[in-house]
UniProtKB/Swiss-Prot annotation:
Tagged with keyword Metal-binding: yes
Quaternary context: Homotetramer; dimer of dimers.
Family, as annotated: Belongs to the isocitrate lyase/PEP mutase superfamily. Oxaloacetate decarboxylase family.
Organism: Pseudomonas syringae pv. syringae (strain B728a)
Pfam families xrefs: PEP_mutase
Signal peptide location: none
Cofactor details (free text): Binds 1 Mg(2+) ion per subunit.
Classification of source organism: Bacteria, Pseudomonadati, Pseudomonadota, Gammaproteobacteria, Pseudomonadales
Name of the protein described by the UniProt record: Oxaloacetate decarboxylase
Length: 289
């Protein structure tokens, strides 16, 4: 079977987002998971920023991974992927000029689409990690991303967090990112379908929702009807891999019992040691959360 080119995959992603259906992402974090996802029939995969941080650094999602490290992992995936892969490019690794560099590097890596979010990252001195940049700066980042793109088939999605801002502000941000030329809008923190209807009013570009498995948003037909073309439930496959690795190694060391009682979430917390980073942020950055 002939191998699809990066541009073929980008066209496939655009065909998905131009359809009337809602597609669910596979969490892909290395070349093997990308091949498995394609073989199982997933239409699209996503390389999460949080997962890349875990895979490359064994570190929590505190914007610690560098652009180079993220691109290296994306390149490994892009080398073998036979499904479109979305890159969660966080804040674009800096200001609008950094965003341009991010787009150039991820396009070369073979990514089909990427998201640029308006969270203030990395965490700033004395500021909450959930603070957002201004809408004007967010618009500038999207315009810069579009300027840097060489292959017009690659999709640029603007991302915002509806859970931490008033509805009217979320509506304004979404509409301004659309007006800036974003190929789509990614929204995190939608509570239910009424919330989605409010925020997506007037949006004509494709929507991507990050739901983390919210049971209030499980009606796929309704998601599709409301313009959602991509739904990200989270990264269960990656956390299942952590759990399986732990249990296998534990058994090899002949610790009594084939399986531990620790969940994947508990294992991730144990081995990424987030409390250290929280303490360092409090100690050196005056961040108390």
């Amino acid at each position: 079977m002939p191998k699809a080119s990066h541009q073929d995959l980008r066209r496939s992603f655009r065909a998905l987002t131009s359809s009337n259906a809602c597609f669910h992402t596979a969490s892909v974090f290395d070349p093997m998971s990308a091949r498995i996802a394609a073989d199982l029939g997933f239409e699209v995969g996503i390389l999460g920023g949080s997962v890349a941080s875990l895979q490359v650094l064994a570190a929590p999602d505190f914007a610690l991974i560098t652009l180079s490290e993220f691109v290296e992992q994306a390149t490994r995936i892009g080398r073998v992927a036979q499904l479109p892969v979305i890159a969660d490019a966080d804040h674009g690794y800096g200001n609008a000029l950094n965003v341009m560099r991010t787009v150039v590097e991820l396009e070369r890596a073979g990514i089909s689409a990427l998201t640029i979010e308006d969270t203030l990252l990395p965490a700033q001195f004395g500021r909450k990690s959930t603070d957002l940049i201004s809408t004007a700066e967010g618009v500038g980042k999207i315009r810069a991303a579009l300027e840097a793109r060489v292959d017009p088939e690659m999709s640029i999605f603007a991302r915002t967090n509806a859970a931490i801002i008033p509805v009217q502000e979320a509506i304004s941000r979404v509409q301004q990112y659309q007006a800036a030329g974003a190929d789509g809008i990614t929204i995190v923190g939608i509570r239910d379908f009424d919330h989605l209807a409010q925020i997506s009013e007037g949006v004509t570009v494709p929507l991507m929702l990050v739901t983390y498995g919210n049971p209030e948003l499980h009606d796929n037909a309704r998601l599709a009807e409301m313009g959602v073309r991509v739904c990200v439930h989270g990264h269960a496959a990656y956390f299942a891999a952590i759990k399986a690795t732990y249990d296998c190694l534990r058994e090899q060391r002949q610790i009594l019992g084939n399986e531990s009682n620790m969940s994947a979430t508990e294992l991730t917390h144990t081995y990424t040691q987030p409390e250290d980073y929280v303490e360092w942020a409090r100690k050196f950055m005056n961040v108390n959360e």
